Amino acid sequence: MEEIQQQQQQQQQQQQQQQQQQQQQQELTQEQIMEFKEAFCLFDKDGDGCITADELATVIRSLDQNPTEQELQDMITEIDSDGNGTIEFSEFLNLMANQLQETDADEELKEAFKVFDKDQNGYISASELRHVMINLGEKLTDEEVDQMIKEADLDGDGQVNYDEFVRMMMING
């Protein structure tokens, strides 16, 4: 009885994963899908519809992504849904959809940082933060602005650099 329930749970999980994957794939444009298919086929030497982990690394790098070895291992573990050690095109497509979403988030953070960094010197000062907060309708005291800077300023230089800004945004989401 318990075994049947476990099988049903596994089937439900697989169906949910497939639905998520289909949704992610739908967010890709036809042009993106064709570009990914082209790259995938270039490295699928024997034409069996699968690529190895090493080939995956080469494909991803050919698409201007530069993951570390650990990131590659994590990707493979995450996307090799059937656990056969090779990557089918549908699994590859899911990976690339995820990568694009992460890239979009990075771009949004860079744009947000530029809004705060008025003089474009790579740092957000207390006065720049105060200026943006006032424009957003936030009436903060000097102490509150200083406190915000202090919380985000990990290296203690009195300003917030991009890495500190990203960390702050990830924590406060």
Curated annotation (Swiss-Prot):
GO terms for molecular function: calcium ion binding. Ca(2+) 4 binds at residues 153, 155, 157, 159, 164. Ca(2+) 1 binds at residues 44, 46, 48, 50, 55. It comes from the Eukaryota. PROSITE patterns: EF_HAND_1 (PS00018), EF_HAND_2 (PS50222). Residues 1-26 have a biased composition (Low complexity). Residues 31-66, 67-102, 104-139, 140-173 form the EF-hand domain. Pfam families: EF-hand_7. Belongs to the calmodulin family. Potential calcium sensor. This is Calmodulin-like protein 11. It comes from Arabidopsis thaliana. The lineage of its organism: Eukaryota, Viridiplantae, Streptophyta, Embryophyta, Tracheophyta.
